[in-house]
Amino acid sequence: MRKSFILLFACICTLLASCSTEQTPTRADRIRTQLLTCDESSVIVVAHRADWRNFPENSLEAIQSSIDMGVDMLELDVQRTKDGVLMLMHDHNLDRMTNGSGDIAETTWEEFSKLNLKDHQGNLTEYKVPTLEQALLLCKDRIMINLDKADRYFDEVFALLDKTGTGNLIVMKGGQPAEQVKEKFGKYLDRVIYMPVVTINNAESEQAIQAFLDELKPVAFELCYSNAESPVPAKMKTTLKGRSLIWYNTLWASLCAGHHDDLAVEDQDGTYGYMIDTLGARILQTDRPQLMLEYLRSRKLHE
């Protein structure tokens, strides 16, 4: 009897140990799965340059604020210093965002470390310019990242992804035709999510989208349009249904035919709602992530 009890206890311990080693999907994993499975049950919110209204754009503090807010993905801009350090900044020079001046490509990381960031009103803050590696580690398991301007440094970016174990976080985008994408980035396409960016103001854009569907079968397309009379955006809702998610930008009027963030302050249904209901958007990039999240939650389109 005693031996049977010991054997049973050992089996239970083994079972519990095996269960504990099974990895629970992280928040980033869940968002990635939504992309890969073309799940249209909710809307993915992308914060443009992170939460730049409350902290300097592309800063660690803006990233953390976005995570706390419940944002799903960040758009972050990558530059490289004179001594080869990949860091976050939109502009190619220091003037607008720091208390320094000159080109980033002519500035060493040591020189960067002495600078402070400015907020969106030009006020100097105590916050520092982050490296890409710092940002990746902060985002790990917590939020997806769309790296902008990073295709110039693909090999170096991937070395950092391997080092930090964050390859599952990354979305890369570009405006090149499908054949060029395969030729230039082919060895990476099975490791990260790649989304084509297509301006859909004319019929030629439909051919470009079809080429991507045939060649790469992307999980999503970023679509831009400025002509409110164009029939193509509504047509894309049908064309891409069940095949690829649709990403639109509500940052300014020329990207979304006037259905932009500033108008959403007074009319979310006519802006965000229009992009979702009429055009089939399931990924929206915004400069007002808190406003967008509140609207989506009111419609049960976001957790």
Task: Give short role names for the model-derived ranges.
Residues M1-A28:
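Bacterial Sec-dependent N-terminal signal peptides
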Residues C19-E303:
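Phosphate-group recognition and catalysis centered on beta-loop-alpha active-site segments
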